[in-house]
Amino acid sequence: MMAVRSSIIFAQTSEVIGSEHTIIQSERQDGRFLSTYGVVHAMLANIEPECAFQPDMTAEEFREWQHKVRKSMQEIMKFPEVKDMPSPKRLYSKQRDGYKLEKWEFYPLPECVSTFLVLIPDSLRQPVPAILCIPGSGGSKEGLAGEPGVAPKLNDDYLNPKVTMARNFAKAGYVAVAVDNPAAGEASDLERYARGRNYNYDLVSRILLELGWSYLGYTSFLDMQVLQWMKTQSYIRKDRIIVSGFSLGTEPLMVLGTLDTSIYAFVYNDFLCHTQERALVMTAPDKAGIRPFPNSIRHLIPDFWRKFNFPDIVASLAPRPVILTEGGLDRDLDLVRAAYKMTGRLENVEIHHYPKYADPHSRTNIKALPEGLDRNEFYKLVNVDGANHYFKSELILPWLKKHLE
């Protein structure tokens, strides 16, 4: 009887929710909303980010804007001041085919020990460029290094070159340093016993938000410690350190790139999108009457949208070399190009699209996305081919060679 009743309720819900509810609009003459969702949606739509890139800036205004972006990033990332922590410690060194694999631990907070892997090419005879490698959702430093996970249930597809970012770099002659994202890989909780690589990022993110921090703030703080350690190693060229992020890893890449101007170049392996707009246009309810939210709470940073969006941050990296491997809307990518052109180094930005959208005529080319989208419709409009989302060494290694040799 309960199952029958549930089916009836579901059917009634489906009938009640018509296509007119995909667009958020007030039914009142004064434009106000009774629905709280309508209220907050309108509030978000009215936000103009303080640090939005303006293509008509002068060179001096551009430099001042970069400083404003950096200061704003410092404010919202909320890195703690921690002193007198122990120095990082090497746990082991093992020989692999063509490179040495080291494991290190470091102590970023009084409550925390974290680990990273270092891949050092056998061909090394003098200091060489080094790449900090940050995995995507569900990934681990072991997968990036071509190693089994710390437990069988945590194994990535670690022999697949579309996964082994750090190993690919080491094989090409660069030092590669691989980290875990918080709550994943070796930094996970009970996943190794049951749910495997379906990591519970959200639990950690909730607690960090309650502490007045954020998942991205915590992630970037840890990654910054590893970046600073890299600068102290005699076999690494400190003027040629690159940050490479895959998917989720592009977010700490943007933070590190904004805060540390000594980073030489960036590998952005994901599509670029305007995240505030993404939240505004994905409004289509499902059959149960539930509207989507673009991302989980591990992507939420208080005040982020009041400051900037992803294209603004990538634009602020100019004129340092950057490669974007999975496209997005030309509107957003052109904004990045404009920043590099403004600095006189347009050649320092290289942009690729998914092969499915390599032909400009196959891409959506609009100035503003329409409201009323579900997740699949959004991805289609922003030129994303999710089945081919992987680390694109075939594009990145030639680009590195061009900028490093």
Predicted regions and their residues:
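C-terminal catalytic histidine-bearing segment of alpha/beta-hydrolase fold enzymes
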Residues: 342-405
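Alpha/beta-hydrolase fold nucleophile elbow
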Residues: 235-247
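Cap/lid segment of the alpha/beta-hydrolase catalytic domain
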Residues: 126, 132-221, 231, 279-282
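Mobile cap/lid helix-loop segments that gate and shape the active-site cleft of serine hydrolases
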Residues: 203, 207-210, 264-314, 319, ...
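Catalytic His-Asp charge-relay segment
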Residues: 319-326, 350-352
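N-terminal pre-domain segments of enzymes
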Residues: 12-75, 375-383, 393, 397-399
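Short glycine-enriched nucleophile-adjacent loop
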Residues: 250-261
